[in-house]
Amino acid sequence: MADGSKAVIQFLRGVDEPVVPDIRVTRSRDGRTGQAIFVFEQPEALAPEVMEAITGMFMLDEEGMLVTREVNGKFVNGKASALEATYTWKSEQDFERFMRFAQRYADSSGLGYSQDSGEAPASDSSNG
C-alpha cells in the first residue's frame, strides 16, 4: 500500500488485488453482528502464474488491517473463476470500523456507495 489514505484488498500479502468485488452487507436487527460478503470475479490472485496459497483476505487502510480467513473458491468446469470472502463482525464498533474501511475502499477504487433499505424502488411511471 503506497499511499496512507488508500484502502486496498489483498489475498497475497503485499500484492494488491486490482479486481473490484461485488460486496453485500447484512446486519442483525439489533445492529451488533453482521457480515460483508465479497465476490471477486476472475481475481488476479487466481491467475495460473500465481503459485502462492491464499490464506485469507486482508483489508488494509490508514487505520490498519482487517482480516478474514473465510475465503472460498468458485469453480466452473474445473477452473477457478471467482473468490468469495466473508468478513463477520460481532460488535457495533467492529461494524463502524468495517464501514470506514468500505468508504475508503470505495473512494480509492472510484466506486459509488448505495444503501439498499430492502424496500421496492419508487417507480417513475404512472399507473394510468
From Swiss-Prot:
InterPro entries: Psb28_c1_sf, PSII_Psb28_class-1
Gene Ontology biological process terms, A to Z: photosynthesis
Main location: membrane
Keywords: Membrane, Photosynthesis, Photosystem II, Thylakoid
Top-rank taxon: Bacteria
One GO term describing the cellular component: plasma membrane-derived thylakoid membrane
Pfam families from the UniProt entry: Psb28 (PF03912)
Membrane topology per record: Peripheral membrane protein
Subcellular location: Cellular thylakoid membrane
Region called Disordered, residue ranges: 109-128
Comp. bias (Polar residues): 111-128
Family annotation (PANTHER family): PHOTOSYSTEM II REACTION CENTER PSB28 PROTEIN, CHLOROPLASTIC (PTHR34963:SF2), PTHR34963
Family as reported in the entry's similarity comment: Belongs to the Psb28 family.
Self-association and partners: Part of the photosystem II complex.
Protein name as annotated: Photosystem II reaction center Psb28 protein
Organism: Synechococcus sp. (strain CC9311)
Gene that produces this protein: psb28
